[in-house]
Protein backbone atom coordinates (compact mmCIF):
# COMPACT_ATOMS: atom_id res chain seq x y z
CA UNK A 1 0.00 0.00 0.00
CA UNK A 2 1.56 3.33 -1.05
CA UNK A 3 2.18 6.11 1.42
CA UNK A 4 0.07 9.21 0.72
CA UNK A 5 1.40 11.28 3.61
CA UNK A 6 3.34 13.67 1.36
CA UNK A 7 0.27 14.47 -0.71
CA UNK A 8 -1.87 15.01 2.36
CA UNK A 9 0.72 17.33 3.89
CA UNK A 10 0.99 19.32 0.64
CA UNK A 11 -2.79 19.75 0.44
CA UNK A 12 -3.09 20.71 4.11
CA UNK A 13 -0.36 23.34 3.75
CA UNK A 14 -1.97 24.63 0.54
CA UNK A 15 -5.34 25.04 2.24
CA UNK A 16 -3.92 26.75 5.32
CA UNK A 17 -1.56 29.08 3.41
CA UNK A 18 -4.39 30.11 1.11
CA UNK A 19 -6.60 30.83 4.11
CA UNK A 20 -3.87 32.88 5.81
CA UNK A 21 -3.20 34.94 2.67
CA UNK A 22 -6.89 35.65 2.08
CA UNK A 23 -8.00 36.33 5.65
CA UNK A 24 -5.14 37.18 7.98
CA UNK A 25 -2.47 39.20 6.20
CA UNK A 26 -3.29 42.90 6.54
CA UNK A 27 -0.57 44.27 4.24
CA UNK A 28 -1.86 47.22 2.16
CA UNK A 29 0.43 46.15 -0.71
CA UNK A 30 -1.72 43.05 -1.26
CA UNK A 31 -4.26 44.58 -3.63
CA UNK A 32 -4.63 41.88 -6.30
CA UNK A 33 -6.38 38.54 -6.03
CA UNK A 34 -3.85 35.88 -5.05
CA UNK A 35 -4.40 32.17 -5.57
CA UNK A 36 -2.21 29.39 -4.19
CA UNK A 37 -1.94 26.92 -7.07
CA UNK A 38 0.37 24.33 -5.52
CA UNK A 39 2.54 23.60 -2.49
CA UNK A 40 5.45 21.18 -2.44
CA UNK A 41 6.88 20.34 0.96
CA UNK A 42 10.21 18.52 1.04
CA UNK A 43 10.27 15.08 2.64
CA UNK A 44 12.28 16.33 5.61
CA UNK A 45 9.71 19.14 6.13
CA UNK A 46 12.41 21.83 6.06
CA UNK A 47 11.11 23.78 3.05
CA UNK A 48 7.72 24.43 1.48
CA UNK A 49 7.71 25.81 -2.05
CA UNK A 50 4.45 27.71 -2.56
CA UNK A 51 3.32 28.45 -6.12
CA UNK A 52 1.03 31.48 -6.37
CA UNK A 53 -0.87 33.16 -9.19
CA UNK A 54 -1.42 36.88 -8.91
CA UNK A 55 -4.35 38.18 -10.95
CA UNK A 56 -3.61 41.73 -12.03
CA UNK A 57 -3.38 43.55 -15.33
CA UNK A 58 -0.41 45.68 -14.24
CA UNK A 59 3.04 44.10 -14.01
CA UNK A 60 4.17 46.51 -11.30
CA UNK A 61 1.17 45.60 -9.13
CA UNK A 62 2.07 41.91 -9.53
CA UNK A 63 5.64 42.62 -8.41
CA UNK A 64 4.46 44.63 -5.41
CA UNK A 65 2.07 41.87 -4.36
CA UNK A 66 4.77 39.23 -4.77
CA UNK A 67 7.21 41.31 -2.70
CA UNK A 68 4.56 41.70 0.01
CA UNK A 69 4.02 37.93 0.05
CA UNK A 70 7.74 37.29 0.40
CA UNK A 71 7.97 39.73 3.29
CA UNK A 72 5.01 38.04 5.01
CA UNK A 73 6.56 34.56 4.78
CA UNK A 74 7.76 34.68 8.40
CA UNK A 75 4.27 35.57 9.62
CA UNK A 76 2.76 32.79 7.51
CA UNK A 77 5.29 30.32 8.87
CA UNK A 78 4.46 31.31 12.45
CA UNK A 79 0.70 30.89 11.92
CA UNK A 80 1.26 27.53 10.17
CA UNK A 81 3.27 26.34 13.15
CA UNK A 82 0.33 27.13 15.40
CA UNK A 83 -2.24 25.42 13.17
CA UNK A 84 -0.46 22.36 11.79
CA UNK A 85 1.28 19.91 14.09
CA UNK A 86 4.38 18.65 12.24
CA UNK A 87 7.87 17.85 13.43
CA UNK A 88 9.50 20.80 11.62
CA UNK A 89 7.85 24.03 10.64
CA UNK A 90 9.03 24.48 7.03
CA UNK A 91 10.58 27.62 5.63
CA UNK A 92 8.19 29.18 3.10
CA UNK A 93 9.57 29.87 -0.39
CA UNK A 94 7.23 31.64 -2.80
CA UNK A 95 7.35 31.03 -6.57
CA UNK A 96 5.28 32.92 -9.12
CA UNK A 97 3.12 30.56 -11.18
CA UNK A 98 2.26 32.01 -14.59
CA UNK A 99 0.53 28.90 -15.92
CA UNK A 100 -2.94 30.43 -15.59
CA UNK A 101 -1.89 33.58 -17.46
CA UNK A 102 -0.27 31.41 -20.13
CA UNK A 103 -3.44 29.33 -20.49
CA UNK A 104 -5.54 32.49 -20.86
CA UNK A 105 -3.15 33.74 -23.56
CA UNK A 106 -3.39 30.45 -25.47
CA UNK A 107 -7.19 30.58 -25.19
CA UNK A 108 -7.18 34.10 -26.67
CA UNK A 109 -5.04 32.91 -29.58
CA UNK A 110 -7.40 30.00 -30.23
CA UNK A 111 -10.39 32.35 -30.20
CA UNK A 112 -8.66 34.64 -32.73
CA UNK A 113 -8.02 31.70 -35.05
CA UNK A 114 -11.65 30.54 -34.73
CA UNK A 115 -12.92 34.03 -35.56
CA UNK A 116 -10.96 34.15 -38.84
Curated annotation (Swiss-Prot):
Q: Which GO terms describe its biological process?
A: maturation of SSU-rRNA
The lineage's top-level taxon is: Bacteria
> What's in the keyword line of the UniProt record?
Cytoplasm, Ribosome biogenesis
- A cellular component term (GO) from this record? cytosol
Example GO molecular function: ribosomal small subunit binding
Where would you find this protein in the cell? Cytoplasm
Which family, according to the similarity comment? Answer: Belongs to the RbfA family.
Q: How does it assemble?
A: Monomer. Binds 30S ribosomal subunits, but not 50S ribosomal subunits or 70S ribosomes.
Q: What does this protein do?
A: One of several proteins that assist in the late maturation steps of the functional core of the 30S ribosomal subunit. Associates with free 30S ribosomal subunits (but not with 30S subunits that are part of 70S ribosomes or polysomes). Required for efficient processing of 16S rRNA. May interact with the 5'-terminal helix region of 16S rRNA.
Name of the protein in question: Ribosome-binding factor A
Gene name, please? Answer: rbfA
Amino acid sequence: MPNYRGGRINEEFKREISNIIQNEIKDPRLTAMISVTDVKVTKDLKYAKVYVSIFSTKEEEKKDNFTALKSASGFIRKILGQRINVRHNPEILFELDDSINYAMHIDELIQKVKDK
